[in-house]
Amino acid sequence: MDKKQLLRNLPKIDELLKEEIVNRYLQENSRTLVVDSLRQSIDHYRGEILKNNIDSFTKENVVNYFIDTLEENKSTKFKKVINATGVVIHTNLGRSLLAKEAIENVVKISENYSNLEYDLKEGKRGSRYSHVEELIKKVTGAEAAMVVNNNAAAVMLALNTLCEEREAIVSRGQLVEIGGSFRVPDVMKFSRAHLVEVGTTNRTHLYDYENNINENTGVLLKVHTSNFKIMGFTEEVSSEEMVQLGGKYKLPVMEDIGSGTLVDFSKYGFTYEPTVQSSLEKGVDVVTFSGDKMLGGPQAGIIVGKKKYIDKMKKNQLTRALRIDKMTLAALEGTLKCYIDEKEAIENIPTLNMILSSKDIHKKRAQRLKRRLQNNVKDFNFKVSEDLSMVGGGSMPGERIPTYVVKVNSDKITAEKIEEKLRLSKNPIIVRVSKDEVILDVRTLFERDFNIIVEEFKKLLK
């Protein structure tokens, strides 16, 4: 059949509305939703005809596509996915998972009225920051603290407060890109601080900072390169040295440590990453870090440091534009409470638990997943292998975590096709593919995911 005839054969919406099955959906759903879904189905077949992808179709084909489209339109676009990649803080999959305590606090606060900005003791307007400030101070040792909606906002607010229209001196080797083309120089530009680059990419000395200090200098800035490492012939100025220099010239020292861990991971066999507490102990005046990376909480930009600087930031007009909402505050409060006891934090915060859980535990879990798949899914080969997980989220660059995975292949379907079908399934499963094998890393899987994975694998060859 020629293209013009195929286009003429496309059914009209009014015609499809008379179909019994469509009419049944019309009784259960709004007319607008049904009509829009019918239009999408017709448009789909029109597009396929114009691209010469089909040479025939039936009204039943159009109706079946309409049913799938309707169900897709009814479902939320923001979906739960299963992370089988082994990347713990997966930026594209939502970064850190919340602790049970954080989730319960969010539910309690979001389904009820709350004292968000109300002082119950005094019976008058209060501050939203008061709900977490004392907790942050307790777990970090800071004089004062406040929270905004992400770490880029925290850096921008701090720089705008400390050195608007003045100079911020920073090492050239620390002008990082934090993802999505967001770069420290650009954040500084919008903060209205003037960037002064010193040193070279691989080596910066204390005199590089001192030689550039003048009457217009507002802050000495240190940025932790949490998402990359420079190896070899390198030199950087320590926080202690910068604090001494800042004291000499009466300048505040600010440090953005990015991922913002409160746990010293070197105690557990990892490469040392600066903690928030260590930066403050060295005398840094203002420290900024993320809430949804190594902290294991919600997206937030946390600012800690000297009270005189934090108080100025709270009064900055930018603060209202960057302020944190009640649900994020609730999640952050629940997360921070876990940190009162480090052991409890590691046990209850999923991000920490996944990173620090032993390889032996995951060997047993991988074997369980393999058995379930072998017992329920035909025409696939499954094997347990040693592999490496990643921390992710621009944290601990180069660090790999020994793990166990289930590797999958089949003579009847390619690994790339398995990956695609799992990703597009009703319960999206995100996997890795290597050497024509699909890799399921159990480090980032929960036991509750295993049955879903088995069910989705059973559908792959249908």
Swiss-Prot record:
Function, in words: Converts seryl-tRNA(Sec) to selenocysteinyl-tRNA(Sec) required for selenoprotein biosynthesis.
Gene Ontology molecular function, alphabetical: L-seryl-tRNA(Sec) selenium transferase activity
Cofactor(s) listed: pyridoxal 5'-phosphate
Protein name according to UniProt: L-seryl-tRNA(Sec) selenium transferase
Keyword match Transferase: yes
Modified-residue entries (N6-(pyridoxal phosphate)lysine), positions: K293
GO biological processes: conversion of seryl-tRNAsec to selenocys-tRNAsec; selenocysteine incorporation
Pathway(s) served: Aminoacyl-tRNA biosynthesis; selenocysteinyl-tRNA(Sec) biosynthesis; selenocysteinyl-tRNA(Sec) from L-seryl-tRNA(Sec) (bacterial route): step 1/1
SUPFAM superfamilies the UniProt entry points to: PLP-dependent transferases
Keywords assigned by UniProt, alphabetized: Cytoplasm, Protein biosynthesis, Pyridoxal phosphate, Selenium, Transferase
NCBIfam families per record: selA
Cystines in this chain: none
Source species: Clostridium botulinum (strain Langeland / NCTC 10281 / Type F)
Main location class: cytoplasm
Matching Pfam families: Se-cys_synth_N, SelA
